[in-house]
Amino acid sequence: FWAFNTIAGRAAVDEVSPLLVVSVRWFFVSILLTFLCRKELFETWKVLKYRLKWLVIMGLFGFTSFNSFYYIAAHDTIAINLGLVQGTMPAFIIIISRIWLKEKINIPQLIGVIITFVAVLLVVSSGNLYALMKLQLNKGDIVMIFACTLYAVYAVGLKKKPNIGPLVLLTFFSYVAFIGSLPGLFYESFTSNLVLPGIKGIIILSIIIIFPSFLAQIFF
């Protein structure tokens, strides 16, 4: 399901502006989840209102910010690079777990981190050591690395989640994500960078809403 995000993110270039994608994405996901979890929302809020800071940080880092930088990066790099950089996310999660939670990195994890980065470098350079030495990251790649770091913080933060079902928790995250996306959408509008979707853009948005936004998050 995550793969749809990479493909749709690139397809959205020139069809719908990146920050509009984020706002529309979480607006419709929040409506869908509210309907599905309507019976649990009130009781869940009784728990989450005491974890409001955690809820806001998680929603902003893992959803609003990650998605915003992801779709911005898609304008400056190719889908393969997006997928490759995103493939390093488990390594970022291990590193941030060490920094934030002081978790020890065991030998298999360390080997996994090394293999992940080496594999990405080999693919990017086509196995050519000389090409690797001359490798230059473009703007989109750098933005994508930053986006993955933000999502890694979110993934590690999930270890501190209260005893709440994943679907209803995702519902509250989607509220934060949508509200948090509005300043970016306003900025995009006021700077004349807003691109409204046509038929193709609507199809792309629908794919993003259903697969990486809803199904992928639930299974994650």
Please name every model-derived segment.
Residues 5, 28-32, 85-99, 114-115, ...:
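Alpha-helical transmembrane segments of compact multi-pass small-molecule transporters, enriched
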Residues 20-31, 70-110, 147:
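Specific alpha-helical transmembrane segments that line the substrate/conduction pathway
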Residues 1-6, 34, 40-86, 122, ...:
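Specific transmembrane alpha-helical segments of multi-pass solute transporters/efflux pumps
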Residues 4-16, 21, 28, 67-77, ...:
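Juxtamembrane C-cap of transmembrane helices in multi-pass membrane transport proteins
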Residues 33, 56, 105-127, 148, ...:
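Hydrophobic transmembrane alpha-helices of multi-pass small-molecule transport proteins
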Residues 46-50, 83-86, 99-122, 134-141, ...:
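Loop-to-transmembrane alpha-helix entry segments
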